[in-house]
Amino acid sequence: MLVLSRKLNEAIQIGDDIEVKIISVDGDQVKIGIDAPKHIEIHRKEIYLAIQEENSRAASISNDLLAKLSSQKK
């Protein structure tokens, strides 16, 4: 993991298209701004993990349903 220090209003560039800027610092809370193309999905980590879990659950249900449907056709 690359660890970088930034001050207020300083930024980090990721590739050609993504900029991460420090917007404010208030105690232990840091607000960042992310400028990225619209096709790049950006989520807080806990939201991303919840999305992944829900997608896995939905895929599992779909596979179970597909298996039941194919066994009924026989």
From Swiss-Prot:
Compartments in which it is found: Cytoplasm
GO cellular component, one term: cytosol
Keyword Calcium: no
A Pfam family it matches: CsrA
An individual GO BP term: regulation of bacterial-type flagellum assembly
Keywords from the named record: Bacterial flagellum biogenesis, Cytoplasm, Repressor, RNA-binding, Translation regulation
Residue spans crossing the bilayer: none
GO molecular function: mRNA 5'-UTR binding
Gene3D superfamilies listed in its UniProt record: Translational regulator CsrA
First-listed, main subcellular location of the protein, grouped into a coarse class: cytoplasm
InterPro entries hit by this protein: CsrA (IPR003751), CsrA_sf (IPR036107)
NCBIfam families assigned: csrA, PRK01712.1
Family label: Belongs to the CsrA/RsmA family.
Function: A translational regulator that binds mRNA to regulate translation initiation and/or mRNA stability. Usually binds in the 5'-UTR at or near the Shine-Dalgarno sequence preventing ribosome-binding, thus repressing translation. Its main target seems to be the major flagellin gene, while its function is anatagonized by FliW.
Oligomeric form and interacting partners: Homodimer; the beta-strands of each monomer intercalate to form a hydrophobic core, while the alpha-helices form wings that extend away from the core.
The name this protein goes by in its record: Translational regulator CsrA
Organism in which the protein naturally occurs: Bacillus licheniformis (strain ATCC 14580 / DSM 13 / JCM 2505 / CCUG 7422 / NBRC 12200 / NCIMB 9375 / NCTC 10341 / NRRL NRS-1264 / Gibson 46)
Gene name per UniProt: csrA
